[in-house]
């Protein structure tokens, strides 16, 4: 099930075939000098993991037919087979560069504003970490996507071997690691806000800046350890072919021997993807949906209490409750936008696992397209957070204006300011201010 490619996730699988069908290769005589590719004729298959004599990456290349073939039944890596070109070219080649620029600008502004001393709060620290990870998720694969799809080099065999390794690291492993950190930070953000709103006394102990920093470091470490085997589970062997009339060294992909000898291909990939679908996709989404519902219910109760305080003319407490509700609402919106982009990925990933391990029912050609679209909309959601912060956080807007328009443009009445998560930093006290 080694199917991770492109920005975040990309399956190149289809209904499984018999071992005889798996080993069937296109006639090498069909290969023409210069390696002219047909238009997107990739064949998508699921290997028989019971037959461990068949090396998985070898098989993955062989099923591509002519676009993966080389003489003497040796295949090499070419990206034309990895993605449906009718979708990959417009999404990755033409739209993604614009999204990359917008994401870099918007998330850089978020980091710049949230890193100011006046914005230094525990949850702002988590929001800043999310912005950095989302930005890196897009930056790492950008050079490869531009080269392959924007500049139209997808039909060429990837070479030399060092380029194959770099492409795998920056287009598969690093984006997956950064996205995993972002998912877990989003979960930490929701848990932290739930503690603030529903268990305020605990926030004094658990939601301090040192604890949040340690938690962020642990999350980054766990995400790195989760992806660490992926740096070493494949071996790229040099293979010389004739390309455009000249010898060219390309990549022949094999599963590393330590996977075969100590774990087994079946167990290795099953464990990796089961962990990912459970702890990166399904469980975080389920917990986030639950916390969002609980936070919304708590916010409704606080709104009723605010009306009571207003009738009793207790304006100071009324203002504190209003600001807390505004902060909670903003974080609910941030998490909801994340869930809208993440849940489809979780669903398709779970369906892929079930179809591969239990009962085969998934149309992998359609799943390929769905994953590409969900990847695209996930990246599309990244710049939206900047608009949410500007629209729903007064102090974010004030700090932004102070940075770019000067202090004269910033309003002087700090008593009405509230931070993204922790209330006002001067006159108004909330449960979060004392942290």
Swiss-Prot record:
Presence of keyword Cytoplasm: no
Segments passing through the bilayer: 94-114, 125-145, 169-189, 212-229, 277-297, 328-348, 369-389
Cellular compartments annotated: Cell membrane
Organism from which the protein derives: Drosophila melanogaster
Name of the protein in question: Sex peptide receptor
One GO term (biological process): G protein-coupled receptor signaling pathway
Summary of the function given for this chain in its UniProt record: Receptor for two functionally unrelated ligands; SP (A70A) for controlling reproductive behaviors and MIP for controlling sleep behavior. MIP-SPR pathway functions as a sleep homeostat which perceives the need for sleep and stabilizes it by providing a slow-acting inhibitory input to the fly arousal system that involve the pigment dispersing factor (pdf) neurons. SP-SPR is one of the multiple SP pathways that induce female post-mating behavioral responses (PMR) such as the suppression of mating receptivity and initiation of egg laying.
First-listed, main subcellular location of the protein, grouped into a coarse class: membrane
Gene this protein is translated from: SPR
Lineage: Eukaryota, Metazoa, Ecdysozoa, Arthropoda, Hexapoda
Coiled-coil ranges per UniProt: none
Extracellular-facing ranges: 1-93, 146-168, 230-276, 349-368
GO cellular component: plasma membrane
């Amino acid at each position: 099930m080694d199917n991770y490619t492109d920005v975040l996730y990309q399956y190149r699988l289809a209904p499984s075939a018999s071992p005889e069908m798996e080993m069937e290769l296109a006639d090498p005589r069909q290969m023409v000098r210069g390696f002219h590719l047909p238009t997107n004729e990739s064949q998508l298959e699921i290997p028989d993991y019971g037959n461990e004599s068949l090396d998985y990456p070898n098989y993955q290349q062989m099923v591509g037919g002519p676009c993966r073939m080389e003489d003497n039944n040796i295949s090499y890596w070419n990206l034309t087979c990895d993605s449906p070109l009718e979708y990959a070219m417009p999404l990755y080649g033409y739209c993604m560069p614009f999204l990359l620029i917008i994401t870099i600008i918007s998330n850089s502004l978020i980091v710049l504003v949230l890193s100011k001393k006046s914005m230094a709060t525990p949850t702002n620290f988590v929001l800043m970490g999310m912005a950095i990870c989302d930005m890196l998720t897009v930056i790492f694969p950008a050079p490869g996507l531009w080269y392959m799809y924007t500049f139209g080099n997808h039909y060429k065999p990837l070479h030399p071997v060092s380029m194959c390794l770099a492409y795998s690291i920056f287009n598969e492993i690093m984006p997956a690691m950064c996205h995993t950190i972002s998912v877990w930070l989003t979960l930490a953000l929701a848990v932290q806000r739930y503690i603030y709103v529903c268990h305020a006394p605990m926030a004094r102990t658990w939601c301090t800046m040192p604890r949040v920093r340690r938690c962020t470091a642990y999350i980054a470490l766990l995400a790195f350890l989760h992806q660490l085997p992926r740096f070493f589970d494949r071996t790229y062997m040099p293979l010389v072919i004739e390309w455009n009339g000249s010898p060219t060294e390309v990549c022949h992909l094999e599963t590393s021997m330590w996977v075969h000898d100590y774990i087994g291909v079946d167990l290795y990939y099953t464990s990796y993807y089961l962990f990912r679908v459970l702890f990166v996709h399904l469980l975080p989404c389920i917990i986030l949906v639950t916390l969002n519902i609980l936070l919304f219910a708590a916010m409704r109760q606080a709104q009723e209490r605010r009306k009571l305080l207003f009738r009793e003319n207790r304006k100071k407490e009324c203002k504190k409750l209003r600001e807390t509700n505004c902060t909670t609402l903003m974080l609910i919106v941030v998490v909801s936008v994340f869930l809208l982009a993440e849940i489809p990925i979780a669903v398709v990933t779970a369906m892929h696992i079930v179809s591969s391990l239990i009962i085969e029912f998934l149309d992998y050609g359609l799943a390929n397209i769905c994953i590409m679209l969900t990847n695209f909309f996930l990246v599309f959601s990244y710049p939206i957070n900047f608009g949410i912060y500007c629209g729903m956080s007064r102090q974010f807007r004030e700090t932004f204006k102070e940075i770019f328009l000067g202090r004269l443009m910033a309003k002087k009445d700090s008593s009405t300011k509230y931070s993204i998560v922790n209330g006002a930093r001067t006159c108004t006290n909330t449960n979060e201010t004392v942290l």
